[in-house]
């Protein structure tokens, strides 16, 4: 007797349906029952009543602003980083500022930033247009004396520590 036939008729095995019979099909659980059960649980949890506190007011009668909301709506038509077209554009007041005729510190900072960036731009343009130009880097010699040696190579000017370094530089082919 083989081991297969030994356990085939054993009383320990539970009777089971054949492979192709419908008893083996898994019945799918309906989702409606689960959804209803969760809705009932949520309804039971939300039965208690909460007291809503009265709205806060400051001593001057205004509502507090904790930095999460602003009275201004952002304008998408203006570019953030566009430079002012004329000096009068920095002094032009917005619609709300015309009514209140006040400037907030943030607006003052924006104007200061524009003014500083315009001044820096003018300074850099004036340095490039000046006849003196940049004189190069002044390297310090071994004895502490400053020697100014600038060399031009392929359209760029750079400083070297001495004439020996300049001799080792490759010569451009067009010279």
From Swiss-Prot:
Tell me one GO molecular function of this protein: mRNA binding
Subcellular location field? Cytoplasm
Q: Where is the composition biased (Low complexity)?
A: 35-47
GO cellular component terms, semicolon-separated: cytoplasm; nucleus; RNA decapping complex
The UniProt family comment states: Belongs to the EDC family.
Q: Which domain of life is it from?
A: Eukaryota
Q: What is its main location?
A: cytoplasm
Q: What species was this sequence derived from?
A: Saccharomyces cerevisiae (strain ATCC 204508 / S288c)
Q: Which UniProt keywords apply?
A: Acetylation, Cytoplasm, mRNA processing, Nonsense-mediated mRNA decay, Phosphoprotein, RNA-binding
Which cysteine-cysteine pairs are annotated as disulfide bonds in the entry?
none
This chain's function reads:
mRNA-binding protein which stimulates mRNA decapping by DCP1 and DCP2. Involved in the regulation of expression of multiple genes involved in glycolysis and gluconeogenesis.
Give the protein name, as stated in the record.
Enhancer of mRNA-decapping protein 1
Feature: compositional bias, Polar residues: 1-27, 58-77
Q: Which GO terms describe its biological process?
A: deadenylation-dependent decapping of nuclear-transcribed mRNA; mRNA processing; nuclear-transcribed mRNA catabolic process, nonsense-mediated decay; positive regulation of translation in response to stress
Q: Where does this protein have compositionally biased stretches of type Basic and acidic residues?
A: 100-113
The record's region (Disordered) falls at: 1-113, 155-175
